[in-house]
Amino acid sequence: MAKQALNQLTAAVRTETGKGASRRARRAGKIPAVLYGHGTDPQHLELPGHDFAAVLRHAGTNAVLTLDIDGKEQLALTKALDIHPIRRTIQHADLLVVRRGEKVVVEVTVVIEGDAAPGSLVTQEASTIEIEAEALSIPEQFTVSVEDAEPGTQFTAGQIALPKGVNLISDPELLVVNVVNAPTAEELAEEGAGEVTEEPAAAEAEEAGEEEAAEAESE
């Protein structure tokens, strides 16, 4: 199901820029942003933090935003987000100007559904694929079914069914999902034993290195 331009946000034009102004905006519950594209000069904005985060949480980063900027409507896509490494809050957003009917290139999430055959292990090699679609018709996600898939089964980007009007940009041979034989209990036990025996060896090597360093210092 494609997203529609229903994500209304009122954006204020920023009169101050710089780190200090950005910190003040965030303390006031706003998110600093820059809007660019179509040859226009970058426009510095402030977005309502709670509302913007809610749109991304419920509709995803490919959601088309309908911005109200000084009473004028502007469609935009979220191009990049700066996330605080500890608090995981949005620090800044880059927004791309889009127009109705315009095609854009975006990355769309791939999800796995179903249960593979007994004795198999499913690994996801790529979490997204890159596609080209109209800005107002970007798929929310793509689904790969691994129901009853046997070990040795692979799903590439080119095998994912795309809606009409959506073109694949990623390499069609890009491996997205891989079904392999699940490790046996014996293999897991051997792997665990190998890790245990490696630890003392590493400790001995470290001690030897420390002794050599100490001898070198004493000379």
UniProtKB/Swiss-Prot annotation:
Task performed by this protein: This is one of the proteins that binds to the 5S RNA in the ribosome where it forms part of the central protuberance.
Region (Disordered): 187-219
GO BP annotations listed: translation
Cellular component terms (Gene Ontology): cytosolic large ribosomal subunit
InterPro entries in alphabetical order: Rbsml_bL25/Gln-tRNA_synth_N (IPR020056), Ribosomal_bL25/Gln-tRNA_synth (IPR011035), Ribosomal_bL25_b-dom (IPR020057), Ribosomal_bL25_C (IPR037121), Ribosomal_bL25_long (IPR001021), Ribosomal_L25_dom (IPR029751), Ribosomal_uL5_bac-type (IPR020930)
Source organism phylogeny: Bacteria, Bacillati, Actinomycetota, Actinomycetes, Mycobacteriales
GO molecular function list: 5S rRNA binding; structural constituent of ribosome
Acidic residues bias spans: 187-198, 204-219
Keyword Metal-binding part of the UniProt annotation: no
Name of the protein described by the UniProt record: Large ribosomal subunit protein bL25
Highest rank taxon of the organism: Bacteria
Subunit structure: Part of the 50S ribosomal subunit; part of the 5S rRNA/L5/L18/L25 subcomplex. Contacts the 5S rRNA. Binds to the 5S rRNA independently of L5 and L18.
Family, per entry: Belongs to the bacterial ribosomal protein bL25 family. CTC subfamily.
Alphabetical keyword list: Ribonucleoprotein, Ribosomal protein, RNA-binding, rRNA-binding
Coiled-coil regions listed in the entry: none
Gene: rplY
